[in-house]
Amino acid sequence: MFVLPRYRLSSRLRECDDAPLLLYYKGNADLNRTHVINMVGTRHCTEYGKDICRRFVDELATLCPDVLVVSGLAYGIDIHSHRAALDNGLDTVGVLAHGLDQIYPRLHRDTAIQMTSQGGLLTEFMSRTNADKVNFVRRNRIVAGMADAPSWWNRPKRAAH
């Protein structure tokens, strides 16, 4: 595990007004890649949404094999984009809403372990910090701040534009 002070954060994230002062990081991915895409969407994705997500990452791996895929390790589009990236040999970083000493949801533990050697896990929360509703909102600003543009997949109808 590394502690990344503000000056070592990804250059994109440092430009955000509300960038965290430090991040805890476990992994090997370069957070300052030329190409970084975030993939976020509903936790209750459809089969069509999963398929489109998979096909997009398959194509992305061919066109831009050095891209870093960033998401939140949550149910739905998040976990499907992480797994698609791993399956295509792409690095993927999961931004957590809790400390690095736990994985939430537990069902994603095996994927998270694989990500530490093919990407990484990143959080602003100290160990023993539990997943809490407000932490997910704080996590989302990091996911958004790490990429050049947001990427919404299978967005729920009630999501903000």
Residue ranges and their predicted role:
Residues V3-H161:
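Glycine-biased, small-residue-rich flexible motifs in mid-sequence functional cores and linkers
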